[in-house]
Structure formats: C-alpha cells, structure tokens
Amino acid sequence: MSLWINGEWTTGQGEALEKRDPVGSGLLWQGHAADDAQVQAACAAARAAFPAWAKRPFADRQAIAEKFAALLEANKTELTRIIALETSKPRWEAATEVTAMINKVGISLKAYQTRTGEQHSPMPDGAATLRHRPHGVLAVFGPYNFPGHLPNGHIVPALLAGNTLVFKPSELTPHTGEAVMKLWEQAGLPAGVLNLVQGARATGQALSARPELDGLLFTGSAGTGYQLHRQLAGQPEKILALEMGGNNPLIVEDPDDIDGAVHLAIQSAFITAGQRCTCARRLLVKRGAAGDAFLARLVEIAGRLRPDRWDAEPQPFMGGLISAQAAERVLEAWQGHLSRGGKPLLTPALVQAGSSLLTPGIIELTGVRDVPDEEVFGPLLGVWRYDDFDEAITLANATRYGLSCGLISPVREKFDQLLLEARAGIVNWNKPLTGAASTAPFGGVGASGNHRPSAWYAADYCAWPMASLESPTFALPQTLNPGLDFSGKEQA
C-alpha cells in the first residue's frame, strides 16, 4: 500500500509502478499509481481537514513539525540509505540531504515568524495590523534529485502556515516519498492534513486539474513548469510557485589559485553527478595563460573522478544519475555538441553498460553556432573563452534561464559589476554555484521560475496577507467631512 489518503494507507488503482536500482537494476520498490478517483479523494480529504487544521493554535502545528524533525534524526541512517539507493548518490551526500531536512524545520519556524507572522503598528486612534492566512489546499510536486529535501522545503512551511496538502513525489523516487510520509504519520498529523499520491504524468495532470486546489508548489524541469503554468492560466485565484532549472554560467577571470578555482568549478559542475538545478552548465574562461592553466588542470582533476555505487568504500565524489536513460540523454547531448563542431576536452563514458554511472564530460564550444539553450541535467560542462569582462557578462546573460551565476576572481570590482548586470536570482563570488544559504531566498527569473518559492521566502507562498485597521472603541469625530450633518436630535 503506497498511497496515504485521509489518514489511511491504501493501494493505488492506477498503473503499476516500480523503481529499480539506477546502477544495478535490482528492484527497490513497487506499487501502483493513484487513479483519478483516488486523486479526487486525496484533494477532498485535504479540503475537509483544512478548517480545523487552520484554526489549531500555531503551537500545535509547531509541535508536530518538531516531532517530525526528531523522527528524521532518529531514522537518519535508514532514510539516508533509501535516498542513496533510489537516486544513486553517495551515502555521504544522501546524509547531508537528511540533515538539511531536519534543519528546515527550525528555519521554517523562524521564516514564518519573520516573514509572515503578525505585525502591529500604532495609529493615533487605534492600530494597523498585518496578519497572514493559509491559502487552503495546496499540491506539492517533488523532484527526484533531492526527493526528501526539496519537497520538504514546501511541505514544512505550508503545514506551519495552516494549509493542508496533497503531495506527489517524482515517479523516479517513490520510496523516499513513502518513507517520509510514514514519519509524518508518526509525528501525529491529523487525517487528511497531508496526503500522498504516487504516479507519473497522468497522476500529476489529474492532481493539477482538481478544483479543490488553492495552489500548487512545484520543483522540477522548465518543460513541466511551463505546462503547469498553461494549465492554470486564467485562474489567478490559485497560487502557483515554480522552481525550475537553469543553464547556469560560471565565469573564471585570471584566478590566482588554480587548484582552488578548479575545486570550485568541480563542486559547481559535477556534484550530485550534475543533477542540481544550480549546477554550472557553461564555463566562461578568459583567454590567456592563466585561463589555459586553469582549463588544463580542470580536465586533469575531473578526469580522476570515478563514479561508484552509493555504498562504495572509499566513498566516491559522484554517484550515478537517476537512471540509465538519464545517462544516455547526457551522452546524446554530448554527441549533439560534437556534431555542431565542439572540441572535446574530456570525453564522458559509462562506467558499465546499462548503468547510470557516467564520468564527467567537458567540451569547448567557443564560436559554435546553434548550441541549444537547454538544461542538460548531468555531468556535462561546456566551455567558452572570452577576451574581456563585458563579453563574459554578455555570454552569461545569453540564456532564457536565470537561476544562478558565479564568478571566480580575486577582483572585487568585477563582482560588483556582475551584481549590477547579471540576470540571475543567485549570484556568487568565489563560491560554488551550487552553494546556497538557508536564510536567503532561493530561485530565479525567466525560465528558472516565478521568483523565490523556495528557502527563506517559501513562507511567502504559503500564506496571504490580511491587513486590518483596529480600534476597541469608536466615537463621532469632532471634525466631519464636508456634506455630513449630525446636528439635532439622534434618530430613534
């Protein structure tokens, strides 16, 4: 039984689903998708549970979220294993994901109070008060690259705000979604407050079309995000939060520490096997001896990376991609770059046939025409050379996306210029593109999404503001507006 609807585990009535080990192809999980009737039942359960949940004291909702965090800590080893197996990321990295899930509860509590709590402003004859109210029933669509952490970043703040939810994890990581839901169950969530529906595209389309929804929180590809935007067009009453991908540039300008710069580039491009939305896809390197030395060292160090199983010892830097099919798509993109005239610097290769273990690829694309402005979700890095910093910024902004952008340079003035001219939601200096602060907003512009539905600003998407002018008493003003006459006796 893989669905959790109205406080009960049940078997899906839709198509059969299974999850296999991306590296070894062994069966990890099997179940069935929710059919349309079960999606409707999940939304109806969330709608029925909303009034009571929204009216519960905030302290009650906080206590359940904190119990969930404690359960994550108690079950960290097992949840780490499940995430690592499903995604094929190394154990060390899966463990950091669970830690991020635990920390998200405290961060969300602080963000709720800071960004969406009550604010009172005194007035001469009363007070102005800002309060926030939950939207109602929200759908949460989770991605596969961080199947615990990223949906958690929507679920926790949404529940704290008083919303009820229907959660659809990625069909590529159903086991993680089920395992996390069982911890919420143990934390004591009332029936219907959080519901789980498994499934692929058909389930997602059925869920996003439900009239019971007051909003949808999505993390995933730009293609799916655009489809959801079209589907909800003409429904301004529904909140739609889209956190999508990026074709992210990393500029390298005369680094004074070659190995330090190479380390930042590898962390930016190849961590999580290149499956982070903030990963560097385009490396912009200044022409000259320093740039040549940097590139040569990058190719050398990246060539030493050996992807391996999640539980291999010693632990690898990279695991595999989410599936063998995903690895093949990266290789197809590589071949496309070659066919357009790209110069291979480091050729990617499968560690074993039929596996998702793929070594990094680096290809120079300077002067190559018609390079697709698409996010290749894997360990593939394109290189462009430039002559001056203005050209670098022009290249960096030459994308429909706008998620992350970074600069490796000892010169602060270069970063100041980039801050003014970059079109990206995250702009880092001498830090990995994949680095983000939990106390800062996360998101981008353009095809990367509608601004900041994640991290510190997630609370903004989970509640709407209510403004009030308040006074415990009232009386006839001494000075009246023109045309008002209160003279004579009071009318009986």
Swiss-Prot record:
EC number(s) on file: 1.2.1.71
Entry annotated with the keyword NAD: yes
**Pathway(s) served:** Amino-acid degradation; L-arginine degradation via AST pathway; L-glutamate and succinate from L-arginine: step 4/5
> Which residues act catalytically here?
243, 277
Gene3D superfamilies in the record, alphabetically? Answer: Aldehyde Dehydrogenase, Chain A, domain 1 (3.40.605.10), Aldehyde Dehydrogenase, Chain A, domain 2 (3.40.309.10)
Residues engaged in binding NAD(+): 220-225
Q: Which GO terms describe its molecular function?
A: succinylglutamate-semialdehyde dehydrogenase activity
The domain of life is Bacteria
**Which InterPro entries does UniProt cross-reference here?**
Ald_DH/histidinol_DH (IPR016161), Ald_DH_C (IPR016163), Ald_DH_CS_CYS (IPR016160), Ald_DH_CS_GLU (IPR029510), Ald_DH_N (IPR016162), Aldehyde_DH_dom (IPR015590), SuccinylGlu_semiald_DH_AstD (IPR017649)
Question: SUPFAM superfamilies recorded for this chain?
Answer: ALDH-like
The EC category is oxidoreductase
Keywords attached to this entry: Arginine metabolism, NAD, Oxidoreductase
Q: Does the keyword Nuclease apply?
A: no
Q: Which reaction does it catalyse?
A: N-succinyl-L-glutamate 5-semialdehyde + NAD(+) + H2O = N-succinyl-L-glutamate + NADH + 2 H(+)
Task: Give the CDD domains listed for this entry.
Answer: ALDH_SGSD_AstD
What's an example Gene Ontology biological process for this entry? arginine catabolic process to succinate
- Name the job this protein performs: Catalyzes the NAD-dependent reduction of succinylglutamate semialdehyde into succinylglutamate.
Provide the family line.
Answer: Belongs to the aldehyde dehydrogenase family. AstD subfamily.
PANTHER family, per database record: ALDEHYDE DEHYDROGENASE-RELATED
Q: What is this protein called?
A: N-succinylglutamate 5-semialdehyde dehydrogenase
